[in-house]
Amino acid sequence: MSKVQSITRESWILSTFPEWGSWLNEEIEQEQVAPGTFAMWWLGCTGIWLKSEGGTNVCVDFWCGTGKQSHGNPLMKTGHQMQRMAGVKKLQPNLRTTPFVLDPFAIRQIDAVLATHDHNDHIDVNVAAAVMQNCADDVPFIGPQTCVDLWVGWGVPKERCIVVKPGDVVKVKDIEIHALDAFDRTALITLPADQKAAGVLPDGMDVRAVNYLFKTPGGNLYHSGDSHYSNYYAKHGNEHQIDVALGSYGENPRGITDKMTSADILRMAESLNTKVVIPFHHDIWSNFQADPQEIRVLWEMKKDRLKYGFKPFIWQVGGKFTWPLDKDNFEYHYPRGFDDCFTIEPDLPFKSFL
């Protein structure tokens, strides 16, 4: 059989997916976090891998799914939160635009799996399966009640799950995880299709979503999940020291308010008294595509007049950020390589060839 005859759609998928293979898994495992620092990697959407100076590994909102894949059904699912929000009927054209940079089934060293809320792009059955199958049998799954309900429904033992609500603190080795109030109003209208939201007081946010503050020996990280802007960010900033804050940013389509704008991101950072603010979530959905440079432009316009005490950082999916080593950087660039040029003699026809 010739090579072209032996190749199938399945063999093509297995040879190219996930796009980064185990490259990032290996990078994270090999990373030695220096004392007085923490390292984190952006996994896409609001997915974050955090590693402390003590070698503690936790992942938050790691999602391995995708968006729309077919024009087959031109209508939105009845009762979808976006339909409730804007009274729309047409299918939402939200295609995933970000590659898969971490292989969940190549994960071996992990100390906790966390989710901020139960929306499909923030909690993942494949991650749960991979951790259950390949990692230590005491790795906890931490999240609000709706997330724990999902995990247990997928087959994660109830005793492996920890339900958190605002005010709760969970210690995972040298990382202290504080569950804080979430401000994700979209979560409150994510309801069963037959349940009406109009004229009904929403149930509590606390069972549906939380924000997290990760206190590590090398600094503190604030993860806001899918939260919108809220005045209560200032309360969190008053009560906690925050070094780096992550905020869900995007260009909201007409009739929709689901992501923070550039102005919201700056207000969040100012309210939290953070040193660095990093937008995320803008990478993942084609119909919420936004340019994070807008945040920096607006910051440049306002920083001197408003005496901002923080800087924005523009990240790339799969990239690493180390606090405090990267605190004065404005943008991430993937490693460019070739730092060992002329280690050996070039093999060129003559010196001036290039």
From Swiss-Prot:
Reaction catalysis annotation: L-ascorbate 6-phosphate + H2O = 3-dehydro-L-gulonate 6-phosphate
Induction: Induced by L-ascorbate. Repressed by UlaR.
Superkingdom as given in the UniProt entry: Bacteria
UniProt pathway annotation: Cofactor degradation; L-ascorbate degradation; D-xylulose 5-phosphate from L-ascorbate: step 1/4
CDD domains: UlaG-like_MBL-fold (cd16284)
Keyword DNA-binding on entry: no
Keyword DNA damage tagged: no
PANTHER family on file: L-ASCORBATE-6-PHOSPHATE LACTONASE ULAG-RELATED, UPF0173 METAL-DEPENDENT HYDROLASE MJ1163-RELATED
Protein's name in the database: Probable L-ascorbate-6-phosphate lactonase UlaG
Native source organism of the sequence: Salmonella typhimurium (strain LT2 / SGSC1412 / ATCC 700720)
